[in-house]
A protein has these predicted regions:
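Gram-negative bacterial Sec-dependent N-terminal signal peptides
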Residues: 1-24, 605
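Glycine-rich, small/hydroxylated-residue low-complexity segments
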Residues: 25-639
Length: 639
């Protein structure tokens, strides 16, 4: 039986198709499979100019593709050589890959270029590997989480790479040297090292130039930057940058020995870290529009809400001030950053010269237990339009700081002459009511100021001070809600070889609701406030005795005669302002007892009734003594 023409034509097509399939080699298979896998990885527009087999290697030439989405990056690759490990599909098994002549370009002008990428021990999808190139910073980010986690490798090496990127609405160039990713396991990198980085403004742009020596990052999760969802991701276990030098925004040179990082985590959210930073880069910081400010605030608020940073530490900073004078910091560290809260901000070893010829060194300056979560919440409200610039700032937006510490401060002239020193100054605050801490304690110790000129000697000689002024001070304030009182439990200033002065007082009528409404309720609170009791105590340490001796000698009088003269003058003055003769005599007697044997003198004022502070202020305008009739007065000497 003869075959029909239609059957003959069908057989010919089948033979040609089968022959074509038989001729296709591993390179063609790999090319087709990689292109087919790209759409699932948010990659598209893929084309391979040529796919050929070269011994045991598959060579793909003139490869183009791009990431998809609202910020696509187009990629051109001259050649991809895959040696070993091909499986007839997109999947690789222990392959060696060399990618040559790579360029990536985004629509906004950001781009990168590298001559060569070498990958050893590649496992997984070739399309996913190429997806790590479809980004503004190859292998630091990826086109998608699926592309970042779609492969593994023993190591990835990039000998050199140049980026053109946007920073604060300006373009800069970053040149990376010898990038190595060791132990890449589906987005997680055991170790990444960079031999050197140089960033500088692109031609015609203003900006800083910065050079960084060796960089090392451990436990880096590159998928954290592109991940969204509901779980917190550890983006970095630790890292460091060595030997940094450059110029500041004011074109002042600086160097930093080392910057190190502790664990960095990214909390879940709808936008990835890469998307957030790209949005921030698009915003002109100098933009005056309301929309620009709102967008900027929103991104910053989200970053601070979602990034948890264990520690950032800077060591060995040397630079200069705006006046060109040297500034150095031995160590600067921020610890415990989480959702607007900071455990501590710490400076040690500050050394700064000033334009007035003085040099200041500070052993340590620390700010501890900072809560700025309310400020971040306000930034979110500003971003979404529920808060506008004309509204009063709510008390919850003011940062809550629990402790400030300053140690070992020394101020000298450049000649070496000391002007003053301080051993320690500490402020501690308790929980707040509105913007006011319910408890505040401040203590200053070891303040020393030398007496350096004739004018100072003339002023301080009557107190017996000729070489130095040494003093300490302490303040403790507490708000007692039940009593509606603000109590100054102590305000004490003590000068060595002179004496100490201590003030204890209270202010009543302070309702919690009015305090919570500050600063808007300041006027109402001022009218409601009432004077409480007050005690002022002086304890002698030689100052009064020296003053009496000094002035008596200058007046050409004996000390006893001079004391009697002071007693008479004091008695006359007290009698003028205190009508109660018995009280006036008691005060005069106590004052005389103190003059005869200076040990201590205490004055206590107790309100005779409710005394509004506003009324007291009016009374005090004429004379301090005009308010005396409002109080019961008690003076005690040497108790």
């Amino acid at each position: 039986m003869m075959r029909t023409p239609s059957r003959l034509r069908l057989s010919a097509v089948l033979v040609i198709a089968l022959s074509s399939t038989a001729l296709a080699g591993p390179a063609d298979d790999l090319s087709r499979a990689a292109v087919a896998a790209m759409p699932a990885l948010q990659l598209g527009a893929a084309a391979v100019g040529e796919a050929r087999d070269d011994g045991s290697s598959a060579v793909l030439s003139n490869v183009t593709f791009s990431s998809t989405g609202d910020r696509p990056v187009g990629v051109k690759v001259n050649r991809i050589t895959v040696t070993g490990g091909t499986t007839g599909s997109d999947a690789l098994t222990n392959a060696r890959i060399v990618i040559e002549g790579i360029e990536g370009t985004a629509a906004d002008g950001q781009s990168y270029k590298t001559d060569r990428v070498e990958i050893a021990g590649a496992q997984g999808s070739l399309a996913a590997i190429l997806g790590s190139l479809a980004t503004r910073e190859p292998f630091f980010q990826g086109a998608s989480e699926a592309s970042v986690t779609g492969f593994s490798a023993q190591n990835v090496t990039i000998p050199a790479m140049t980026l053109q990127r946007r920073r604060e609405a300006r373009m800069e160039q970053a040149v990376y040297r010898d990038i190595r990713l060791n132990g890449y396991q589906r987005g997680k990198v055991t170790e990444m090292t960079i031999a050197g980085i140089v960033t500088s403004p692109t031609e015609g742009q203003q900006g800083q130039r910065v050079e960084i020596g060796a960089s090392r990052f451990l436990g880096l999760d590159t998928s954290a930057g592109v991940r969204t969802g509901t779980t917190t991701t550890v983006a970095l276990d630790s890292g460091s940058l060595e030997q940094i030098r450059g110029t500041s925004a004011q074109n002042r040179p600086f160097t930093i020995d080392r910057i190190s990082f502790g664990k960095v985590s990214m909390r879940p959210g709808e936008r990835s870290l890469v998307a957030l930073t790209q949005t921030l880069q698009d915003i002109d910081p100098a933009g005056a529009s309301e929309e620009s400010r709102r967008r900027s605030m929103g991104v910053v608020a989200e970053l601070f809400s979602r990034l948890d940073i264990e520690r950032v530490e800077l060591a060995g900073f040397r630079g200069s001030s705006n006046e060109g004078l040297p500034v150095a910091v031995t160590r600067f560290a921020i610890t415990g950053v989480s959702q607007g809260r900071i455990t501590s901000i710490d400076f040690t070893g500050i050394d700064a010269a000033a334009a007035n010829g003085q040099n200041t060194t500070i052993g340590r300056f620390s700010i501890e237990t900072i809560d700025a979560s309310g400020l971040i919440a306000l930034a979110r409200e500003f971003s979404d339009g529920s808060f506008s610039a004309g509204k009063p700032i709510p008390p919850t937006a003011y940062p809550d700081i629990r402790r400030i510490l300053l140690e070992n401060v020394d101020v000298k002239e450049r000649s070496g002459q000391r002007l003053g020193k301080l051993d320690r100054f500490e402020i501690e605050g308790g929980p707040r009511v509105g913007i006011m801490p319910t408890r505040l304690r401040a203590k200053l110790t070891g303040f020393e100021a030398p007496i350096t000129n004739a004018s100072q000697r003339a002023q301080l000689a009557p107190l017996g001070l000729t070489e130095n002024v040494n003093l300490g001070a302490e303040l403790e304030i507490e708000y007692v809600e039940g009593a509606k009182e603000l109590r100054m439990r102590t305000f004490n200033v003590e000068v060595d070889d002179v004496g100490s002065l201590n003030l204890v007082m209270a202010i009543g009528g302070l309702d919690r609701a009015q305090i919570e409404a500050l600063p808007g309720s300041a006027a109402v609170l001022g009218l409601a406030a009432k004077a409480g009791g007050l005690t002022l105590t002086y304890a002698e340490d030689g100052g009064v005795a020296s003053f009496i001796s000094h002035v008596a000698k200058q007046a050409g009088m004996g000390e006893d005669d001079f004391k009697e003269q002071i007693k008479q003058q004091a008695g006359m003055m007290i009698g003028q302002f205190i009508q109660d003769r018995a009280l006036a005599e008691q005060i005069t007697e106590a004052f005389g007892e103190f003059l005869d044997d200076p040990t201590s003198l205490a004055i206590t004022l107790t309100p005779k009734g409710d005394i509004p502070l506003a009324a007291l202020a009016v009374a005090l305008r004429g004379s301090p003594f005009a308010a005396m009739p409002m109080f019961n007065i008690e003076v005690k000497a040497n108790e």
